């Protein structure tokens, strides 16, 4: 009989739930993966600006999940944006926690058109900005800005999946990550 692995995701967004389920199914093929999304407050603005605000949002979601739910792993993803010296970009922070260790990872950057980033600075969420620019509906629960700007060669889910895949490394090799010398 297969062991069941309970995963709590700090969001009800199907893109985030699917990304988490994908990586746990990949890393634990012998297990039955029970992946549930829950509403978890980020404690940051709906559209985080800057790396720190984005990371803190993901960590807050995971910490809320740990406090209010019981699971083998807790996962959160938070999308943010920032103005860099080379231009505006969007990215995500991911956090995975198994009650013993908490690992923070980050996705790659997607360059953002300056006009779209400026709308974020005025308080709009990226999903809403993209829906207006591309005449779409609720793109944040589909391919996201990433899908729209890459002509669907990458998507919000594929980007979360890659970041989560990399963030799992310390859980897979704890003997190496626990060493300091």
Named regions from a protein language model:
Residues 2-71:
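N-terminal polybasic phosphate/anion-binding patch
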Residues 46-181:
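Anionic-ligand binding patches
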């Amino acid at each position: 009989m297969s062991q069941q692995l309970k995963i709590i995701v700090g969001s009800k967004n199907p893109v985030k739930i699917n990304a988490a389920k994908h990586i746990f199914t990949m890393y634990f093929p012998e297990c039955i993966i029970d992946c549930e999304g829950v509403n978890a407050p980020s404690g940051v603005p709906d559209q985080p600006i800057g790396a720190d605000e984005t990371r803190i949002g993901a960590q807050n979601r995971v910490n809320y999940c740990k406090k209010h739910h019981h699971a083998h792993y807790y996962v959160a993803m938070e999308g943010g944006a920032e103005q860099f010296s080379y231009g505006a970009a969007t990215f995500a922070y991911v956090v995975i926690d198994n009650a013993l260790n908490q690992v923070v990872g980050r996705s790659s950057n997607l360059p953002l058109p300056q006009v779209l980033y400026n709308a974020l600075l005025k308080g709009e969420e990226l999903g809403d900005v993209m829906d207006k620019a591309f005449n779409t509906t609720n793109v944040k629960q589909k391919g996201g800005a990433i899908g729209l700007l890459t002509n669907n060669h990458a998507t919000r889910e594929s980007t979360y999946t890659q970041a989560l895949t990399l963030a799992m490394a310390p859980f897979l090799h704890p003997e190496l990550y626990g060493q300091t010398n």
